[in-house]
Swiss-Prot record:
Catalyzes the attachment of isoleucine to tRNA(Ile). As IleRS can inadvertently accommodate and process structurally similar amino acids such as valine, to avoid such errors it has two additional distinct tRNA(Ile)-dependent editing activities. One activity is designated as 'pretransfer' editing and involves the hydrolysis of activated Val-AMP. The other activity is designated 'posttransfer' editing and involves deacylation of mischarged Val-tRNA(Ile). Its EC number is 6.1.1.5. Binds 1 zinc ion per subunit. This is Isoleucine--tRNA ligase. L-isoleucyl-5'-AMP binds at E554. It comes from the Bacteria.
Length: 917
């Protein structure tokens, strides 16, 4: 008889190699065919709900790793909540309006000048819907589960109607108004931008110091004195109407070689250095407070215009001269302080950034090119004291990457000032995973200006505003709701297809239009108003969802974006935050922490990861990141992730192979009758389960990633499964010792598969399909393991044993190196107490020590002679085992015997083989 035939070797069809790129789509097809998304909802119908509201990605372009990070994190959460019994619908969404789609069509050769606005918008819509289908396919390929057959899309008529109603309610409360104010203006996009559409890059700019002569000294300063201003935007000097000083700062009149200059005293040294003044020739003649300088009149350096000295609290001594060049048409602080003094708002720049006729001799010049012309003129007039160039952080258009300017134009605004405190209060009542998240959005709301909600484009939701013949604005509850009803029925394109009178309620009249003629607003809404209306357009509209959402989760850039616009519109109309809990993640960088770019050749995209390695590798990578900060990805990092995956897969496969002949309904051993080592592992499983559930609850996936590896590698592979081979393969099939271990092994396999399911969605499903006797058709329709109290005394006892076992392994390794033994089964271990640990007493309660240490013989004595090696948990001696090697189990025994014709079997193997012969 071949002894191998008598061994109970592992058997499973679960393959060693994952083959994920080919296998995952098959698993997904099965899920789709079974409509698993709705099955999971049906299972938990009537239970407590959990609503994670999806922030809509922009419907343009291929997915990047940031998209993958975001959607996979959301999927972890929703799948976990579902397995915890929550009714957790997930409705993905898309943001579809805005400039990038207009630009994409232009790149494709669509000439908008050859078609009507309505026709061009139709093409934009078609393009957006095509992009959604492509992105949808890629999101699903990542294993993300949701209602992809019925997502929310910001261009859908019912969504646009909800957005218009929010606008109307805000208008009713006096929160929407029109004004000429300086706003971020992008000449490259020919449109105003919100703060969320601004990003900062380094820019080289002119740095100039300019002298303004005093025209009317008001009896305060010397008539021949000059104010010095500093600016990095020479092109705004033609729009100067004032010089702002801080009322509480000290200012000095300095005589420098006969010239009298007024600057802040705190900046005098810095100015002297910048202007190369000889400090020995500088004399402080007079001192004033900024308040005393108020209403002194200076003369514009080259225009026939006065420049009034005014007070403003925004003036600092961080840089410059303490005398701030003020052009209300080109700066927010300038505008605000200018309103107080009723200063004119001059902004002689057109949509393209070119000087208009109002710009006089600069007419026709691009603003940036005008910098040189202005400095040349200042030099000619003797007003330019210094020209230099500096590189500084400057606002750019987030789409075109070109610099932006502040420009006063007629715009529509949503008032932040009127609801700011309410929003801040709502933030205080919102939960955050990390305090800095709360601080970040709180400070952004606290410090932000009014929200420019108008855009001078065509692909977006129109502002539902009409104008009477006399120019009066018509924006009533009646007219706005009528437009909302029209949009709900026909979509917003109707605004561009019908005349104004046909968009107003039937029979509508207005005293400002005696002839019954009306015009309509041509601007559209900021796309952040679109996505920021999703709490109404989605949460309050879809029957399976509810308001407010339990959670919003997006990239950290959304503190100024979607998080901000959503809470603004929600607080303004509903009085509460649209989210109860806010969580954010960082950006995806390359392996060295650098930004990914095609030029650096360091770009990794989801499609590439999925095709080469599989979605489960991408998902495992997400779980391995500290996602609250920026995360890293590279081929090397993905290789490490794949290695971890392989270990997880092989451990699960080993367990599957060893429970192939086990039926939990008939073969399970009651817990009270389990071997103590098995009870220890059962309690370790419970401990691991409690920790994993806690980590899921706290969104700590990195902890799960690390603890899974620790449990699988240290507890299972390095100990329990290694120890178990001598039992699972060698003992009789139905023996108590084998069934005891299989009982626990089965529990570990089932619970581990469930705990891994939200992360390794495909692999967990594959394991489940190979696990015998499971009740649910899919692991994703099963419940998470329950948290059970652990036997702490048992855990403490066995932790001490595991430490002692580590000492034995160290001793075995030394003996191996000294050629005393080869494999550990060739060893006889003698353990004794020492000064550090009473090993002999401790080990009295342990059975089958030779199996636990994976050696042939173990002897425990009170004391050993000086030849023993002292370890932390006892003195240990390793010798070669006594007797001969059993040809079946490879343990050494002095009692080898025969069964019929079979020789060289230890007593245990003799007994097992007898039962088979």
């Amino acid at each position: 008889m071949d002894y191998k035939e008598t061994l109970l070797m592992p058997k499973t069809d679960f393959p060693m190699r994952g083959g994920l790129p080919n296998k995952e789509p098959q698993i997904q097809e099965k899920w789709d065919a079974e409509d698993q998304y709705h099955k999971a909802l049906e299972k938990n119908k009537g239970n407590e709900t959990f609503i994670l509201h999806d922030g809509p990605p922009y419907a343009n372009g291929n997915l990047h790793m940031g998209h993958a990070l975001n959607k996979i994190l959301k999927d972890f959460i929703v799948r976990y909540k579902t397995m915890q019994g929550f009714y957790a619908p997930y409705v993905p969404g898309w943001d579809t309006h805005g400039l990038p789609i207009e630009q994409a069509l232009t790149k494709k050769g669509v000439d908008r000048k050859k078609m009507s606005t309505a026709e061009f918008r139709e093409k934009c819509k078609e393009f957006a819907l095509e992009q959604i289908e492509l992105q949808k396919k890629d999101f699903r390929r990542l294993g993300v589960r949701g209602d992809f057959n019925d997502p929310y899309i910001t261009l859908k008529p019912e969504y646009e109607a909800a957005q218009i109603r929010i606008f109307g309610e805000m208008a009713d409360k006096g929160l929407i108004y029109k004004g000429k104010k300086p706003v971020y203006w992008s000449p490259s996009s020919e449109s105003s931008l919100a703060e969320a559409e601004i990003e900062y890059h380094d820019k080289r700019s002119a740095s100039i110091y300019v002298a303004f002569d005093v025209k009317d000294d008001k009896g305060v300063v010397d008539a021949d004195a000059k104010f010095i201003i500093w600016t990095t935007t020479p092109w705004t000097i033609p729009s100067n109407v004032a010089i702002t000083v801080h009322p509480e700062l000290k200012y000095g009149q300095y005589n420098v070689n006969g010239e009298k200059y007024i600057i802040a005293e705190a900046l005098s040294d810095a100015v002297a250095e910048a202007l190369d003044w000889d400090k020995a020739s500088i004399e402080l003649e007079k001192e004033y407070t900024g308040k005393e300088l108020e209403y002194v009149v200076a003369q514009h350096p080259f225009l026939d215009r006065e420049s009034l000295v005014i007070n403003g609290d925004h003036v600092t001594t961080d840089a410059g001269t303490g005398c701030v060049h003020t052009a209300p048409g080109h700066g927010e602080d300038d505008y605000i302080v200018g309103q107080k003094y009723e200063l004119p708002v001059i902004s002689p720049i057109d949509d393209k950034g070119v000087f208009t006729e109002e710009g006089g001799q600069f007419e026709g010049m691009f603003y940036d090119k005008a910098n040189k012309a202005v400095t040349d003129l200042l030099t000619e007039k003797g007003a330019l004291l210094k020209l230099d160039f500096i590189t500084h952080s400057y606002p750019h258009d987030w789409r075109t990457k070109k610099p932006v300017i502040f420009r006063a134009t007629p715009q529509w605004f949503a008032s932040i000032s009127k609801v700011r405190q309410d929003i801040l209060d709502a933030i205080e009542n919102t939960n955050f995973k990390v305090n800095w998240g709360k601080t970040r959005i709180y400070n952004m709301v606290r410090d932000r200006g009014e929200w420019v909600i108008s855009r001078q484009r065509v692909w977006g939701v129109p502002l539902p505003v009409f104008y009477a013949e006399n120019g009066e604005i018509i924006m009533t509850k009646e007219t706005v709701n009528h437009v909302a009803d029209l949009f709900a029925e026909h979509g917003s394109n109707i605004w561009f297809e019908r005349e104004a009178k046909d968009l107003l309620p039937e029979g509508f009249t207005h005293p400002g239009s005696p002839n019954g003629t009306f015009t309509k607003e041509t601007d559209i809404m900021d796309v952040w108003f679109d996505s920021g209306s999703s709490h109404r357009g989605v949460l309050e509209t879809r029957p399976e969802l509810s308001f407010p959402a339990d959670m919003y989760l997006e990239g950290s850039d959304q503190y100024r974006g979607w998080f901000n616009s959503s809470i603004t519109t929600s607080v303004a109309t509903r009085g509460v935050s649209p989210y109860k809990f806010l969580l954010s993640h960082g950006f995806v960088m390359d392996g060295e922490g650098k930004k990914m770019s095609k030029s650096l050749g360091n770009v990794i995209v989801p499609d590439q990861v999925v095709k080469q390695k599989g979605a489960d590798i991408a998902r495992l990578w997400v779980s391995s990141t500290d996602y609250l900060a920026d995360v890293r990805i590279s081929d090397e990092i993905l290789k490490q992730t794949s290695d971890v995956y392989r270990k997880i897969r092989n451990t699960l496969r080993f367990m599957l192979g060893n429970i192939n002949d086990f039926n939990p309904d008939t073969d399970s051993i009651p817990e009270s009758e389990l071997l103590e080592v098995d009870r220890y592992l059962l309690n370790r499983l419970r401990e691991f389960t409690a920790s994993t559930i806690n980590n899921y609850e706290n969104f700590d996936y990195l902890n799960i990633y690390q603890e899974v590896q620790n449990f699988l590698n240290v507890e299972l592979s390095n100990f329990y499964l290694d120890y178990g081979k001598d039992i699972l393969y060698i003992e009789q099939r139905d023996s108590h010792i084998r069934r005891s271990m299989q009982t626990v092994l089965y529990q570990i396999l089932v619970d581990m598969t469930k705990l891994l399911a939200p992360i390794l969605v495909h692999t967990a499903e594959e394991v489940w399909s190979h696990t015998p006797h499971v009740k649910e058709e899919s692991v994703h329709l099963a419940d998470m393991p329950k948290v059970v109290e652990v036997d702490q005394a048992l855990l403490d006892k066995w932790r001490t044993f595991m430490n002692l076992r580590d000492d034995v392994n160290r001793a075995l390794e030394t003996a191996r190196n000294e050629k005393v033994i080869g494999k550990s089964l060739e060893a006889k271990v003698t353990i004794a107490s020492n000064d550090k640990f009473n090993a002999s007493e401790f080990l009295t309660s342990f059975d089958a020590l030779h199996q636990l240490f994976i050696v042939s013989q173990v002897k425990v004595v009170d004391k050993l002679d000086d030849q023993a090696t002292a370890y932390e948990h006892g003195d240990i001696v390793i010798e070669h085992a006594d007797g001969e090697k059993c040809e079946r189990c490879w343990n050494y025994s002095e009692d080898l015997g025969a069964v019929d014709e079979l020789t060289h079997l230890c007593p245990r193997c003799q007994q097992v083989v007898k039962s088979l012969v």
